[in-house]
Swiss-Prot record:
PROSITE patterns xrefs: HEXAPEP_TRANSFERASES (PS00101)
Swiss-Prot/TrEMBL GO biological process terms: lipid A biosynthetic process
Enzyme class: transferase
Keywords of the record: Acyltransferase, Cytoplasm, Lipid A biosynthesis, Lipid biosynthesis, Lipid metabolism, Repeat, Transferase
Annotated source species: Histophilus somni (strain 129Pt) (Haemophilus somnus)
Pathway membership: Glycolipid biosynthesis; lipid IV(A) biosynthesis; lipid IV(A) from (3R)-3-hydroxytetradecanoyl-[acyl-carrier-protein] and UDP-N-acetyl-alpha-D-glucosamine: step 1/6
Function (record text): Involved in the biosynthesis of lipid A, a phosphorylated glycolipid that anchors the lipopolysaccharide to the outer membrane of the cell.
EC number: 2.3.1.129
Taxonomic superkingdom: Bacteria
Enzymatic reactions: a (3R)-hydroxyacyl-[ACP] + UDP-N-acetyl-alpha-D-glucosamine = a UDP-3-O-[(3R)-3-hydroxyacyl]-N-acetyl-alpha-D-glucosamine + holo-[ACP]
Assembly and oligomerization: Homotrimer.
GO MF assignments: acyl-[acyl-carrier-protein]-UDP-N-acetylglucosamine O-acyltransferase activity
Family: Belongs to the transferase hexapeptide repeat family. LpxA subfamily.
UniProt-recorded name of the protein: Acyl-[acyl-carrier-protein]--UDP-N-acetylglucosamine O-acyltransferase
């Protein structure tokens, strides 16, 4: 079904069954598969391929040669009808690739809202991306990676499969990330190592001084106290009673499976 207000270039191929929403613009030489839904106000600029069971929300901007919902690169994949779900107001730049999920990984690759995926970024099967993240040019996420909200991944960085990156993390360019990264941390290197709290980013997002102070103290407990993570958890729990932002650390540690960067 194609909404009457949608504008589709005659060179594009829209397979029967695709659902194209109000005021969608599809430029030249795009291909949209039969199980694709595209929400109101989204633009496919040109040469965009959207396949598989894929849902794209409203007001997204998708640039040339992006490939969304294509067959993933997991050798166990046998053509199951897994999904790709993309939220609203994302900017997906040239040559970005986003692969559909796998049955073993939950069946869905998911992108939230208001993200910027720069040129040549790759998001593999079953990744879960939050809101307002930035992946710089050539950043690559292996399968099952999770990014919290407001994560910045520097250009030419690679994140190992199953890694969890906490909210408000900033990863410097050219990093190789093979273990989980706690919230609010800045890290860089091969392999990535922590080098402080993302204070400037947190200030821009309205974190007040008491909250920043608490986050700094928790960072020092984790990385500078000489104690094990198990030993500092009770102290972090005490901070979380008065500073809700600190609870992100506790949620993160409960979910972490690969150990944290050191």
């Amino acid at each position: 079904m194609i909404h009457s207000t949608a504008k589709i270039h005659p060179s594009s191929i829209i397979e029967e069954g695709a659902k194209i929403g109000e005021n969608v613009v599809i430029g030249p030489f795009c291909i949209v598969g039969s199980d694709v839904q595209i929400g109101k106000g989204t633009t496919l600029h040109s040469h965009v391929v959207v396949k598989g069971v894929t849902t794209i929300g409203e007001d997204n901007q998708i640039f040339q040669f992006a490939s969304i919902g294509e067959v993933n690169q997991d050798l166990k994949y046998q053509g199951e009808p897994t999904k790709t779900i993309i939220g609203h107001r994302n900017r997906i730049r040239e040559s970005v690739t986003i692969h559909r999920g796998t049955v073993q990984g939950g069946g869905v690759t998911r992108i939230g809202d208001d993200n910027l995926l720069m040129i040549n970024a790759h998001i593999a099967h079953d990744c879960q991306i939050g809101n307002r993240c930035i992946l710089a040019n050539n950043a690559t996420l292996a399968g099952h990676v999770e990014l919290g909200d407001f994560v910045i991944v520097g250009g030419m960085s690679a994140i190992h499969q199953f890694v969890i990156v906490g909210a408000h993390v900033m990863l410097g360019g050219g990093s190789m990330v093979s273990q989980d990264v706690p919230p609010y941390v800045m890290a860089q290197g091969n392999h990535a190592r922590p080098f402080g709290v993302n204070i400037e980013g947190l200030k821009r997002r309205g974190f007040d001084k008491p909250t920043l102070h608490a986050i700094r103290n928790v960072y020092k407990l984790i990385y500078r106290s000489g104690k094990t993570l198990e030993e500092v958890i009770p102290e972090i729990e005490n901070y979380a009673q008065t500073e809700s932002a600190v609870s992100f650390f506790l949620d993160f540690f409960n979910r972490s499976t690969r150990g944290i960067i050191r």
